Amino acid sequence: MRKFEAIMQKIVGKEKVLGGTTTQASNILGPGHIKNHAALPSWIGEYDGGVSERVNMISETFSAYGLEMIAADDVKKRKWMKLFALTAIGPLSAIFDLNHTELYIDNKNQSISRNLGKEIILETRKVALAEGIEVSEDECLFMFNKIVDSKQT
């Protein structure tokens, strides 16, 4: 467990701390105009692992109101899943001064940028494996592929 989760648990009690992650991908085109690029689910679970009644209740409530949320038995792995996509999108967007749409979707050289993004993710996977997070290549590429292959709405 990272230090900040331990601090939160110490302050409010372990029973009050859940883990979770969400990924929303969009661009603001102008006042009142937003392009959504990824309808990805959010994940929630007991921080130390497992799905409890409260996790199921929260997941079902959010999903009922239009934000898909999945009860996760291994929320630490889900956090890594998000990190995989972020390692490929954030740094390359900054280096090339392009948002993720310009870099991976509307780019005539998107096959080059996508391959570079995938290589970054596979390198990040090595770190996850060293940290004891078991994740396949397909799993670590899942969120990245959902974002870069998504239809813009």
Report residues per predicted region:
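Alpha-helix initiation and N-capping motif
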Residues: 5, 89, 137-141
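C-terminal active-site/capping subdomain that shapes the small-molecule cofactor and substrate pocket
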Residues: 128-153
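Internal alpha-helical scaffold of NAD(P)-dependent oxidoreductase catalytic cores
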Residues: 11-16, 31, 35-136
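Short, solvent-exposed loop/turn elements at beta->coil junctions and helix N-caps
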Residues: 24, 74-77, 144-145
